[in-house]
């Protein structure tokens, strides 16, 4: 009986993997071959969810795929988030931490306050507000995917939030490098801090840094932007349990409530991967360097595959009519969230510049 229960999820998992493969291939053609980037600035996860939504709404999904798609969204997603921790090396961030961490905290708090006020004004669903908030402040689609299961977000809410964050992330990726060069008078450190705190996705930050480097010959800017963004990504460890607590406390309405019941324990696996990476760098780089580097790269690649498969599964399970019914208001919140994090980042960096002078 148990053996058959495992077999029933295989078709859906395979379908999600096939869609990941198609999405990755399409992204390589679009971002590398056509646009000419060394690495595509477009999120493969976003392409996967769009492909999934297309196929899922054009063709009727067969019953034998459903359980596997649900398994992918629930468990393979969490496995991908756990593996994501292997790419974070906080001990290397100490040099920029004194500047970047306060800046990141101020940006996060400011956006959360603004979005909370907008939610009351525009009356959008609480889950949607949480998804847009964490996507705008921490690390884009990855943060949305990680937060969705702990607040019980619906598939259409996840799809909408990811589309929201991706659109505004790409806009800021294309505009901010040129704006920052003008505003910060070509200072590589301040421009890097601004790009790293104001653009949603890690891939978009890297692309913005690359655009700036190619346009203004400043590799230092790209390095500062990337490090700042990775520091920002580590806040996922704090924000997911916090959002789980706040959301579920709000839903309990006076009933008995336990943080242990809703704590996202996969976050512990994420933290464990961060510890493993830093411990491994200390122990194995001097003795088994090539093996350790290959292992880290393998886990990184696996994380991207698992997360993109989960997005493909979400897309396949999303009904476009549900997205249409959600209206334009969440996009207004997403735009204002993008503008807020940009303005707050500029003002905070200005204060820092004035302090130094």
Language model: regions and residue ranges:
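Juxtamembrane helix-boundary/capping and inter-helix hinge elements in multi-pass membrane proteins
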Residues: 1, 32, 59-61, 88-90, ...
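Juxtamembrane and boundary regions of transmembrane helices in multi-pass small-molecule transporters
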Residues: 1-4, 16, 117-124, 175-198, ...
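Structural signature of multi-pass alpha-helical membrane transport proteins
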Residues: 2-71, 84-91, 238-303, 310-322, ...
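Entry/N-cap segments of selected transmembrane alpha helices
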Residues: 11, 15, 71-80, 84-116, ...
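Alpha-helical transmembrane segments of multipass membrane proteins
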Residues: 19, 23, 111, 115, ...
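Structural signature of hydrophobic alpha-helical transmembrane segments
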Residues: 37-51, 74, 96-109, 133-136, ...
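Transmembrane alpha-helices that form the ion-translocation and gating core
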Residues: 102-132, 172-188, 279-283, 305-313, ...
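Alpha-helical membrane segments and immediately flanking helix-loop junctions
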Residues: 124-172, 190-214, 302
């Amino acid at each position: 009986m148990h053996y058959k229960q495992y077999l029933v999820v295989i078709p859906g998992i395979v379908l999600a993997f096939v869609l990941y493969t198609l999405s990755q291939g399409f992204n390589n053609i679009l971002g590398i071959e056509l646009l000419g980037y060394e690495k595509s600035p477009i999120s493969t996860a976003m392409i996967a969810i769009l492909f999934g939504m297309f196929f899922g709404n054009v063709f009727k999904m067969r019953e034998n795929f459903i359980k596997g798609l649900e398994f992918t969204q629930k468990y393979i997603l969490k496995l991908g988030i756990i593996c994501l921790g292997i790419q974070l090396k906080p001990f290397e961030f100490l040099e920029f931490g004194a500047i970047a961490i306060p800046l990141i905290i101020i940006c996060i708090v400011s956006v959360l306050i603004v979005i909370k006020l907008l939610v009351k004004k525009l009356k959008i669903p609480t889950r949607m507000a949480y998804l847009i908030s964490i996507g705008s402040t921490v690390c884009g689609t990855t943060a949305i995917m990680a937060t969705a299961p702990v607040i019980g977000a619906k598939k259409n809410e996840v799809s909408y939030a990811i589309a929201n964050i991706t659109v505004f992330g790409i806009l800021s990726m294309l505009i901010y490098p040129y704006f920052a060069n003008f505003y910060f008078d070509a200072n590589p450190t301040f421009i890097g801090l601004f790009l790293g705190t104001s653009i949603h996705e890690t891939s978009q930050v890297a692309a913005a840094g690359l655009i700036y480097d190619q346009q203004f010959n400043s590799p230092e800017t790209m390095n500062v932007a990337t490090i700042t963004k990775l520091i920002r990504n580590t806040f996922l460890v704090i924000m997911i349990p916090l959002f789980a607590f706040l959301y579920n406390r709000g839903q309990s309405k006076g009933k008995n409530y336990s943080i242990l019941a809703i704590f996202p324990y996969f976050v512990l696996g994420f933290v464990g991967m961060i510890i493993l990476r830093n411990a491994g760098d200390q122990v194995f780089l001097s003795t088994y360097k090539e093996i350790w580097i290959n292992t880290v790269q393998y886990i990184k690649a696996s994380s991207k595959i698992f997360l993109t498969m989960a997005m493909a599964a979400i897309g396949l399970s999303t009904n476009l009519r549900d997205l249409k019914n959600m209206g334009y208001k969440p996009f207004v919140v997403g735009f204002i969230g993008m503008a807020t994090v940009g303005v707050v980042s500029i003002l905070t960096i200005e204060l820092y510049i004035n302090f130094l002078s």
